[in-house]
Amino acid sequence: MNLDRIEQQAGHLPAYQIADSVNEALMESANLVITAPPGAGKSTLLPLTILRGMSDQALEGFIHNHLKSQGKILMLEPRRLAARQIAERMAQILGEPVGKTIGYRVRFESKVSDDTRIEVLTEGILTRMLVNDATLEGVSCLIFDEFHERSINSDLALALARQTQEIIRPDLKLIIMSATIDASIICQALQAPLIESKSRMFPIETIYADHDIDRYQVAQEMAATICQAFRNQEDDILAFLPGQGEIMKCEELLRSALSSTEIYPLYGNLSPEKQRLAIAPSKPGERKIVLATPIAETSLTIEGVRIVVDSGLCRKLVYDARTGLSHLETVRISQDMATQRRGRAGRITSGVCYRLWTQTSEHLMPEQRLPEILDADLSSLVLDIAAFGENKPELLPWLTLPPKGNLVLAQQLLMSLNALTPDHDTHALSGSITAEGSRMAQLPCHPRIAKMMISSDSPSIQALACDIAALLEEKDPMGENEDSDMTLRLSLLRSARCKKNLGRWNRIAQIAQEYRKMLRIKEDNAPIDAEEVGHLIALAYPERIAHATDHAGNFKMSNGNTIFIDPCDSMAANEWLAIASLNLASTSSSSSGQGRKGRVFLSAPVNWKNLPAQTCENISWDSKALAVKMQQETRIGALIIDSKPIQNANRETVSNIICEAARKDGLSMFDWNESVHRLQQRVAQVAEWHPELEIPDLSTEHLLPTARAWLPFYLEEGGKMKTSVTELKKLNLCEILWNILPYDLQQEIDHLAPTHIRVPSGSNIRIDYRLGAEAPVLSVRLQECFGMTSTPTVDAGRQPLLLELLSPGFKPVQLTQDLASFWQGTYFEVRKELKRRYPKHFWPENPLESQAVRGVKR
């Protein structure tokens, strides 16, 4: 290990100017934050200078004595390509091959040895190391490079590392490095000093478009701008596009326009060999164009690039908590991402950056990208935390706390997969890992896929699960427009393996092989049982078991959503399917099938008899039948396989369901007749007059939400429950409401607000209590009041009634609360008119001395 070469080979890099400051800071602080612009050399240089400081024992107390000669530095990189290139560059500086002093570990690939002192890792590798050994024995320092990307794995790895540092390894050093991060927040959280590299990048000219890029014409607009840049500028071009599809379309257009120019795609699914070709220097005298996803944003140096063309778009994986599906969305990049991309043009010399958006719209872009942990599927994260030994994820020292709702969903999924078992503590998010969960956590894949791979002890079924897992992880080699038959793809994969002619199946075959190594099983290319494929998929995605609802391609899934499969698809003819991959747009809460634009991509037939079904009672309110539905059902999730009526359902359950239905739709469930409304008005009137009586609220607005307090007592009669609206409408609601009141209040209300009053004619006339009116109303024919000297009252004489005096034809002729004054004055005018209209009736000149009558009297 020749560390003297560091200054010779990399001393010119701007980051070398802060190397001593970094080592000095690590003597005083456990944590450190470093910022440096793109191209400063922080990723390739600083790990080496820290290692040199350790080897020279320049950092007194940096590590425990027993680690001084063997403590490793682990540096995390977000992407595999960057990890490989950085390791190769550091090894080159030392004049050594990769795998000696400098090594790397990425998924399914590693180059390390017993002599390795610096390991460049992708983030999932560190998480696995922490889970397997929380002490990180033999490790002195962790470096989180390009931390501004805030991937879910980097946030998790940092949280676990901080927990280790706080509880077990106070000597462990944590370093955060980035070019575009808000360092103040990180420094405060980690109580870490900040060291900034003030070096300047080479000048970069920025050219903005006159309009924002059309998302439906990304390849076309990018190709046009690349051609413009190729004609107007010199040197190589690095173009950023959102995804592989746009790259392939743009490449096709450019090969027609610039046929003599080397064009290289660069994205994650490419083989390492093709990725190395893309980042290698162009041939002398030739120019090249690299079409890349955000994989080339950070850490990578592509020699010869002086021109950047930026679409301003990227793919973002978004988790939909409603459906449990994650899907890719094409979104605008943030300003810090734009800065990173622009910086690719000024790493070696001055450059030019073409931006396919206007300068005005740039101000609308968010300054920083959101941490992935805020809208990601947290299932793997929660399982890793449980395997680490922490049952309550929210207690870890997070920089950004994961959303509680997504944590709950993740734990529910893991419990359904038997990876976690609930703790007794119901007041916090908690779940202990099971033996099966521990096995799942050892596999570098989503818990769903891990569940599928460990579900059987049969080597042939495990081998089949490995093939399925590999197919699900990689882009479908047959394309999305082909038949959705998963078994067909598996057969083609196995056939290609047998013929040693993998071609487009090569990457999938490699992943399947790595999984088989982990499970210690051999390759199996035997014929495939399609229903076994479906059964394995159902283990991974139990909520995506689907049952045909018609013969037109409509299916209902066990999570309640509906999907559509093209009737021409071979899988559409099956009654039962297990869905491995689907377009989010194809899910719907409607069974009509209208408006669906997506479809199922991968599926397999499944025998429902081999799936775990549950027998349960379904007691619910049927809004169509307007009655309680009482069935014993055999179910797979929302799919009903068998249903039988229940004769003697639990009475309390039935009662609660009716009360809940009443809360939502009680106005139409009971007979709210005029008598009920009059009672409610009368009771409310007394409550208004006498609040000291504390009369219960009998208003409909109060009764329906509180139905559980008064309704259950009347739902059973003769040992039989009333379960339908027809039966409920027969309830005497007036009697029920009156009985809500204690007996003493009933007596008081009858005294203060009688329902009727006797008038001189002998008739009992009903009093109309109208809450909010001037006074209760007594509507009575004028002739029946002859001889009544004063206005009748209620409320123990405190409230005169409002008399609505009527003609013999029951038409109002006068309103008054002063009957005595009426007899002395207005009566004579009214008498004249009534005498003319009703000549057969008796209209005396002295009504106070006349006998009240009900009908005609002369």
Where are these regions (language model features)?
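P-loop NTPase motor module signature
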Residues: 1-452, 524, 564, 583, ...
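Active-site lining segments that contact anionic ligands and/or coordinate catalytic metals
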Residues: 29, 351, 463-466, 532-534, ...
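Second RecA-like catalytic domain
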Residues: 44, 253, 259-260, 265, ...
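Short acidic-hydrophobic surface loop/beta-edge motif
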Residues: 194-197, 553-558, 753-760
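Short, solvent-exposed loop/turn motifs
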Residues: 201, 562, 763-765
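Short, solvent-exposed cationic patches
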Residues: 343, 578-604, 779-802
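A positional "C-terminalness" feature that preferentially activates on distal terminal regions of long
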Residues: 537, 568, 628-858
